[in-house]
C-alpha cells in the first residue's frame, strides 16, 4: 500500500478495551483522562481543551461563542468554510480573506480591518502552501485560530484538530486554548473523550519525510515533461508535500486507476471527503472549475528509495498516457 494522501485521511487502529478507561464518571476520579489533558498541555502549551462537532454546524457553534468580529481565510477546511457561510446566512457579519493567484493568502485584505478573531492556519488546504503567521501579525492584532492537523505553529492563539484526517474516523474535533472566556468549557458528559484520546495518539505518531519531495518532483518532471504543470511554487509548500497538475485529464481519473494498484493520491478535500468535487482551493486562487480538476496533491510520511520512487512515477506516467489515449 503506497499512501500519498495521509494528510487527507490516515486511519489508525483503535483499542476499544483500553478506551473504556476514558469513560468519565462524575462520582469517581478520572485519572486517565486527567493525565491525557496534562500531556496535551505539555506537548502544545494550552491549558484548556474541549471537543466540538467537526462539521458546519459545529463551527457555527464556535462562531456563536466568539464575542467579537470574525474573519475567515478561503484557504481553510471545507467544514469551516461551510460553517462560516451558514453563520452569514443567519445575518451575522463576517470578513472573508482571499487567496492570491500564487496560492498565498492576501494579507492586504487584513489591513485596517477591525477583527478580533482570525481563522487562518499555517498552511492552505489542498496545496499546503505555507503561511507565515509572523507576517500575518504585522497586519492584525486578532487572535489567530488555526487548524493544526498538518502543521502546528506556536504563533497560533487557538488550535483545533480534524480527527477524520488524523485518525480516519469522524470523531469530534479537538480545540485547544488558554483563555476560558473565549469558549465555554464543556461539562463532563459532553466531552468526547475518545476523540481527545485518538487525536493525541495520532499526533504523537505523526511523522513526515522531508527527503522524498525533491527526488519525487525531479522524476515527475523527467517522465511527464510538458504534461506536468504547477499552480503553486513547491518551494513554498510544506516540505513533506507536493502539489502539481496534469494537462488535459481530470485528476479523479488517474486517482481511481492508481487506487487499483494500491497507490493513493488526492485532488484535495473535495476528493478525500467523498464530496466528488474538484479542489475549492484552486478555484479560490482564481482558476475555473475545469482547471481545478487537474490538480493532484501528495504528501510523504514514509521513506521511499530511488527504485520505489521511480516505480510510482512510472505508474503515474503509464496511467496518464492510457487515459489520454482513451480520451
What is the predicted role of each segment?
Residues 1-327:
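Pyridoxal 5′-phosphate
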Amino acid at each position: 500500500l503506497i499512501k500519498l494522501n495521509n494528510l487527507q485521511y490516515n486511519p489508525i487502529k483503535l483499542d476499544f478495551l483500553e478506551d473504556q478507561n476514558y469513560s468519565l464518571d462524575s462520582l469517581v476520579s478520572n485519572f486517565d483522562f486527567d493525565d491525557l489533558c496534562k500531556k496535551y498541555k505539555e506537548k502544545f502549551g494550552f491549558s484548556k481543551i474541549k471537543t466540538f462537532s467537526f462539521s458546519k454546524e459545529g463551527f457555527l457553534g464556535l462562531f456563536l461563542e466568539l464575542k467579537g468580529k470574525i474573519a475567515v481565510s478561503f484557504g481553510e477546511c471545507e467544514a469551516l468554510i461551510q460553517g462560516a457561510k451558514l453563520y452569514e446566512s443567519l445575518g451575522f457579519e463576517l470578513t472573508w480573506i482571499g487567496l492570491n493567484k500564487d496560492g498565498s493568502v492576501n494579507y492586504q485584505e487584513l489591513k485596517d480591518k477591525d477583527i478580533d478573531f482570525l481563522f487562518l492556519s499555517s498552511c492552505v488546504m489542498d496545496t499546503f502552501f505555507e503561511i507565515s503567521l509572523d507576517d500575518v501579525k504585522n497586519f492584525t492584532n486578532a487572535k489567530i485560530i488555526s487548524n493544526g492537523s498538518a502543521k502546528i505553529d506556536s504563533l497560533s492563539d487557538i488550535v483545533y484538530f480534524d480527527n477524520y484526517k488524523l485518525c480516519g474516523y469522524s470523531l469530534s474535533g479537538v480545540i485547544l486554548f488558554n483563555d476560558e472566556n473565549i469558549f465555554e468549557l464543556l461539562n463532563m458528559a459532553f466531552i468526547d473523550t475518545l476523540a481527545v484520546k485518538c487525536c493525541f495518539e495520532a499526533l504523537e505518531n505523526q511523522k513526515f519525510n522531508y527527503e522524498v519531495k525533491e527526488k519525487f518532483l525531479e522524476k515527475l518532471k523527467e517522465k511527464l515533461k510538458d504534461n506536468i504543470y504547477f499552480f503553486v511554487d513547491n518551494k513554498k509548500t510544506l516540505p513533506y508535500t507536493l502539489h502539481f497538475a496534469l494537462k488535459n485529464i481530470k485528476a479523479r481519473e488517474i486517482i481511481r486507476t492508481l487506487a487499483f494498484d494500491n497507490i493513493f493520491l488526492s485532488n484535495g478535500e473535495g476528493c478525500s471527503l467523498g464530496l466528488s468535487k474538484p479542489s475549492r482551493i484552486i478555484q479560490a486562487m482564481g482558476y475555473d472549475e475545469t482547471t481545478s480538476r487537474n490538480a493532484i496533491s501528495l504528501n510523504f510520511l514514509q521513506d521511499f528509495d530511488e527504485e520505489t520512487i521511480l516505480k510510482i512515477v512510472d505508474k503515474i506516467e503509464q496511467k496518464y498516457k492510457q487515459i489520454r489515449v482513451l480520451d
